[in-house]
Every structure is written in C-alpha cells, then in structure tokens.
C-alpha cells in the first residue's frame, strides 16, 4: 500500500491506477475465490454497510411485500428496513430465535409465503459468538423463491464461506475485521441469476453506459453496483489481505479461531463474577462477557492499559437483540489465529483480577 501511495505522489493518481490494474484485478479474483464465486459477481465498496445498502436498496419492494429478518440483524440493516417499509408499504417480519438463541428455522418456514420478497440475515452478529444456520436459511429461501441477502461482515476471514453451500443471492463483507485488511474496504457478491430481479439504486458512469437520447445500459455483472471513484490503495491492500487468508487456508483459520474462542469462553465462564453471553449451537471466536461491578467501557479501558485489546457491544448496533435480552453493553473479545494460548491465559488472568478488584471494598 505504501508503494502505491508513493507512486501516486510521484506520477499521479490516474497513472498509478493504470499501472496497478493487475493488482486490482487480483483483488476481484481473490474475493471471488474467498466466497466461492466468480470475479464478475464481485463489486467493491468503501465499507460493508455501503455494500449492503447497494444490494438492499436495489430490491424492488411495494405495498404488502414482506421482508423477513432475524433478531440478530445489524442495526444499520434494521434502519434500512424501516426506511424502505415507510417508503414502500412493505412489511417487516422479525423471525424469533429458537431455544438455542439462533434464528428459528421452523418459525421461518411457517412465516414464509408468496408475499415474502426478501430474507435478510446477519450470519454472525456483532453482539456475540452466535453463528446463525445460514445454509438452512438458504434452503428455505430457495424453496420460497425469495431473495436471500446475507450479511457476512463478521464471518469472512474467520471461517470458510461458500456462497453455493449457503445458497444466498447476495452477500456482503468487510476487509477490516477478520480479513485483517485496511479500513475503508467492503465488497458485495451478487449471484448472476439474481441480477434480473434487482434494480441498482444509483446509475453513474461506472455502473452504466448512456445509449444516447434517454436510454442507458447497466454494466455487466456486479460492476453495475459500483461507483467510479475508488481508493485504489485500499483495494490493493484488501487484495493482499484476502490472498494471505487464502494462503493460510480458511479451514485452518476457522479451526484455530474456534479453538481459541471456545477456550477463552470456557475459562472466562469459570471465573467468579464473570458471565459469558454467547448463544447458538455453533459459536465462533467472538466472545462476550459481563464482569460484575464493572461497566463494559471501564473493563475495556483497564484491559487496554494491560495491552489487551478488546471492544464493547453497543446496543444500537444490535437493537433487536438488545431489546430481547437486555444485557448490553458487554466486553467483546475477538481472538484470531495469530493469538497464542499464553495470550488467552493472560487475558483470563487480567479479567479475573478486574472481577476480584470490583468485589473488594
């Protein structure tokens, strides 16, 4: 990335982008390989929310149409559903979770009908280690003939993703989380057979071509969802991050992160004054916990001073889950493949000290 920035400074942005075209093409190809699709099915964005919006706002919806979604849907997605429902008269139906805390497949099957135009699901929520049964939802969507939009922001780079196994029509992701890429990067994958059912909500010189008069033609494939101006240095960095993940192997990454996550979750759960709050029959490396006598922000700051980087859950990021469980905010741990067992042990010891100190007069 620094090499490209220097090249832009030396010869100019247009010229540097032209020289970097091969690297840019590699990014599309790497992302396609990452999710099991084709390069022409990939569109690039500056974040995953813009990628998700480009997909969602391209779905024609009208009065009486139904959007089915889960209780763990990301907050920005929920806001978009609400806005479009107000504009179009479409109906939002929130599918309940089952006893394990994941989307209830039986309830989803019963709620799907001929009015269902979209099933939108967040695969891994920002609020915990739950891994929703995305492939099972895909089978239900396919049988119903509904479009299936999968938010894989917390999934890509953490474990294997295959759009054909999952059965989604649209999938969105980011570069900055488990892919370990630069901030300001996101992508959309669109199944080619879904294109005819979508109407991109922005037409501009990257996404369409003027035919003369009053006509225009959409660009081929997923490029019709892109905009002309891009940060090519970020695109190059994203490609490098994806290539590294592919070289390491997503199966190996998934096994490693899951093992570390389960170890951390189990060890934290044994500590007096600490409760973990991750749901689902399948869980990933995201671990959430509450420390008695400590606010999440205070605990995160204290751990940060010990060079243990964590974050906190924010109610607005998962409003339906917050409403359901009423336990936010929580401390969120996200171990990755490069972390060691010794670092897990040090983290548990630091949390134990925080919990113990909170209980002392």
Located regions from the model:
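Pyridoxal 5′-phosphate
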Residues: 1-361
